């Protein structure tokens, strides 16, 4: 179990514009976000000595970004081949790297041209490799297809409705309307949600995250060092990564999953709350990995904000609204702000805790939850001021 409570902190954040057509390389986007994070922390580039990135073969490695930025002291580099499930894990890894003495100031970044470049589930080779050889020949080629099956299971088992999924989409859009960097700011009603075109049953267009070009970066350092830097430190209080007994994505792995009415979070929630010494009721807000509306329901249930099967009524009650008992995805989430594979959730959480969120600021926010991942494995952290 991660046991470095409050020893490390987020000292800087950076991000590019989020667009559909960046007209730039992923290296250029990453470099901009990383340089902004360095400047935000009040550091010089030569003080950064660690870089961790994650990608799915669609971006540049950390060493390329280190070269682009001219970092002379990059002693530790790690490129994690994974998706949104590690959007928090990379920062937990940064704390372990610093604890081990391998680096002092570690940049974590994700850069992607997810709309204009390599699109998840987009064009592919005529041959199937890896786990896709068990799925692609049967027409299962995209994440919406997989998650739709899981969602339908929850609907069948607990009576979850499309209107409840729509409540999540509408809430995200309302929050995004107050976010200058959000890609989708136009107000949306529940009627608009139901009018959006079907994609894969039971999902409509507004149940599925955006495709985005952009980059985000987060700088992690020791809490003692962070207190001497430019910004108010945001302490990493608790963290966890993991999943259940079957963490792959082939048909065989999916069929082994105990019950798609829940995902990875029931398996890591206890470790998270124990590592933080806190519980769900202590959170002022939550930034939930929402690649789909349904993933929000699974995370809220799995993390203990409501019981399994009660996520639909919970979101429909207004609890997740900005003025609710647990404001969720205050920036608009992956559904309305942008899809930078989840790292933009940490950007928003840090801004909330610094009191820099403007019109969408959660009153007196001092502690929050960030989750990453939607299916069989994921990560999460509690951060505070």
Predicted regions and their residues:
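Short acidic, glycine/serine/threonine-rich loops at helix termini
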Residues: 22-23, 117-122, 177-181, 247-250, ...
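Conserved active-site "lid/cap" helical segment
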Residues: 1-85, 93, 154-161, 183-189, ...
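Short glycine/threonine-rich loop-to-helix capping motif typified by GTGT followed
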Residues: 57-68, 246-252, 290-313, 376-383
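Electropositive phosphate-/nucleotide-binding environments in soluble metabolic enzymes
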Residues: 24-31, 59, 88, 141-148, ...
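Beta-strand segments within the central parallel beta-sheet cores of soluble alpha/beta enzyme folds
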Residues: 45-54, 76-79, 106-111, 163-170, ...
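Condensing-enzyme catalytic core mediating Claisen C-C bond formation in acyl metabolism
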Residues: 1-24, 167, 199-263, 267, ...
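Active-site-proximal alpha-helical scaffold in enzymes
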Residues: 81-112, 144-178, 218-224, 337-357
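Conserved catalytic cysteine-centered active-site region
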Residues: 4, 54-109, 113-146, 184-210, ...
């Amino acid at each position: 179990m991660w046991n470095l409570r409050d020893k490390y902190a987020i000292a800087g954040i950076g991000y590019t514009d989020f667009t559909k057509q960046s007209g730039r390389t992923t290296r250029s986007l990453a470099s901009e976000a990383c340089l902004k994070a360095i400047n935000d922390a009040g550091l010089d580039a030569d003080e950064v000595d660690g870089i961790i990135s994650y990608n799915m073969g669609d971006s540049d490695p950390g060493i390329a970004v280190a070269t682009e930025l001219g970092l002379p002291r990059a002693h530790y580099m790690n490129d994690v081949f994974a998706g949104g499930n590690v959007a928090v894990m990379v920062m937990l890894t940064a704390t372990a790297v610093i604890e081990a003495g391998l680096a002092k100031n570690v940049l974590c970044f994700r850069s992607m041209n997810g709309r204009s470049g390599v699109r998840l589930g987009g064009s592919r080779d005529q041959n199937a490799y890896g786990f896709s050889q068990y799925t692609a020949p049967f027409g299962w080629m995209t994440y919406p297809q997989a998650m739709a099956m899981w969602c339908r299971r929850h609907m069948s088992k607990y009576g979850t409705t499309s209107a409840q999924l729509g409540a999540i989409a509408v809430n995200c859009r309302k929050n995004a309307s107050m976010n200058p960097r959000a890609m989708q700011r136009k107000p949306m009603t529940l009627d608009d949600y139901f009018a959006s075109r079907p994609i894969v049953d039971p999902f409509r267009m507004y149940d599925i995250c955006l495709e985005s070009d952009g980059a985000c970066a987060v700088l992690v350092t020791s809490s003692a060092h962070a207190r001497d830097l430019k910004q108010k430190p945001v302490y990493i209080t608790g963290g966890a990564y993991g999943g259940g007994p079957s963490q792959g994505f082939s048909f065989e792995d999916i069929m082994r999953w105990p019950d798609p009415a829940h995902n990875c979070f029931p398996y890591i929630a206890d470790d998270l709350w124990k590592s933080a010494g806190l519980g769900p009721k202590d959170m002022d807000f939550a930034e939930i990995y929402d690649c789909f509306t349904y993933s929000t329901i699974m995370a809220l249930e799995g993390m203990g904000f409501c019981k399994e099967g009660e996520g639909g009524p919970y979101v429909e009650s207004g609890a997740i609204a900005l003025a609710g008992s647990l404001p969720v995805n205050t920036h608009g989430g992956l559904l309305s702000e942008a899809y930078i594979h989840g790292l933009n959730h940490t950007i928003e959480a840090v801004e909330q805790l610094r009191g820099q969120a403007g019109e969408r600021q959660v009153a007196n926010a001092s502690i929050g939850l960030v989750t990453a991942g939607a299916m069989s494995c994921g990560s999460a952290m509690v951060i505070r001021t």
